[in-house]
Curated annotation (Swiss-Prot):
GO terms of molecular function: glyoxalase III activity; protein deglycase activity; thiolester hydrolase activity; zinc ion binding
Keyword Acetylation: no
Annotated localization: Cytoplasm
Gene: hchA
Residues the record lists as binding Zn(2+): 86, 91, 123
Annotated catalytic residues: 185 (nucleophile)
Organism encoding this protein: Shigella sonnei (strain Ss046)
GO process terms (BP): DNA repair; methylglyoxal catabolic process to D-lactate via S-lactoyl-glutathione; protein repair
Positions in coiled-coil regions: none
This protein's name: Protein/nucleic acid deglycase HchA
Record text on subunit structure and interactions: Homodimer.
Length: 283
């Protein structure tokens, strides 16, 4: 007999009126083992350049009915690109807006993955003790050692990042100084920080999680309610072109902006980013 899993969001007892995704949605969109593969970089980078990860520092996202979605950065979307980049020779640092610890969607952690989990444990202290983004921004100049800014996905990227002047300054620095910008799924919501000033991403094309898909996820209990705004609509208003309208694991390169559509694109985005950065920073 087939056991039907519930489509009701699961209660997060750590906060009032907060919820994790339903058992059903987790059965459809998470796995205990990732699809990590193709980690083959025989001539890794040996220089000083590294990645700046701008991570989420808030867990609870209000929805239209007042319920809170218990979110953060998606582990697959964070760790698979970093696994590839690290294997290709690029170390990374983590920063959050507040300087407080990164929040992860632990319900999506590939807890049986024999490569990803040791990698996470090895670097957990970076996520637990991040830099404060304002301090990083204050030190940026043309000679800074960051080769790329990486904004992971997860609905946590919708909280704070789109309004942050420090996020805007970091992105402006990256584009103007010919550095890479890497993001996927909901991570490009951070680009909205550029709305109210100098916007060097005007005219760029990206992949991102479709608004249409976000509007469907409450039906299966992934979120306990609908979003109060949709980042894709806002990105288009600021002159960006989202080239996908579905979720296929697609990645895209527009100059040095590298993006993916969902967690299904995390491995491919990691490969693309590693290859592009190795080509740019070859010894």
């Amino acid at each position: 007999m087939t056991v039907q899993t519930s489509k009701n969001p699961q209660v997060d007892i750590a906060e009032d009126n907060a919820f994790f995704p339903s058992e059903y949605s987790l059965s459809q969109y998470t796995s205990p083992v990732s699809d990590l593969d193709g980690v083959d970089y025989p001539k890794p980078y040996r220089g000083k350049h590294k990645i700046l990860v701008i991570a989420a520092d808030e867990r609870y996202l209000p929805t239209d009915n007042g319920k809170l979605f218990s979110t953060g950065n998606h582990p697959i979307e964070t760790l698979l690109p970093l696994y590839h980049l690290h294997a290709a020779g690029f170390e990374f640092e983590v920063a959050t807006i507040s300087g407080l610890m990164t929040k992860f969607e632990y319900w999506a952690m590939p807890h049986k993955d024999e490569k990803v989990m040791p990698f996470f444990e090895q670097h957990k202290s970076l996520f637990r003790n991040p830099k404060k983004l304002a301090d990083v921004v204050a030190s940026l100049n043309a000679d800074s050692e960051y080769a790329a800014i990486f904004v992971p996905g997860g609905h946590g990227a919708l909280i704070g990042l789109p309004e942050s002047q420090d996020v805007a300054a970091a992105l402006q620095w990256a584009i103007k100084n010919d550095r890479f910008v890497i993001s996927l799924c909901h991570g490009p919501a951070a680009f909205l920080a550029l709305r109210h000033g100098d916007n060097p991403l005007n005219g760029y094309s990206i992949c991102a999680f479709p608004d249409a898909a976000d509007k469907q996820t409450p039906e299966i209990g992934y979120m306990p309610g609908h979003l109060t705004w949709y980042f894709g609509e806002e990105l288009k208003k600021m002159g960006m072109n989202i080239i996908n309208d579905d979720i296929t694991g697609r990645v895209h390169k527009d100059r040095k902006v590298l993006t993916g559509d969902s967690p299904f694109a995390a491995n491919a985005l990691g490969k693309l980013a590693a290859q592009e950065m190795l080509a740019a920073y070859a010894d």
